Amino acid sequence: MDAITIEMQVTVVPAEFDDIRTTSLVGYLDARFADLVARLGEPRRYDEAGFKIDAEWLLKDASGLLGALTVYNYKNGRNYNGAHAAPVEQITDWNVGGRGGASVALAKALFGAHFTAA
């Protein structure tokens, strides 16, 4: 049997911290901050020296079938690296957190070729 490609349309809604508890790295995203804001809305922002992230989106599949995702920068922003690092608006390398295959499917549906599974 030949492979069948199925394109999925998903709707994501903001998630709460309880929704993303116990997530871990599932992949990487190559995207401009402005494009993520246009697609996902404004992220949660953190302004704390030594903190490992600067911005984070908490998302979940509205149907509940594909679980939750986090999109965040990790150790590549000013919080972790100081003022000489690029501001969050210039970051293009993002981590994606989730729970296994369902989260990978959700990330692929949302971000297509910009997402690479870990």
Regions from the PLM with identified roles:
Residues 2-118:
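Residues within mature, well-folded domains
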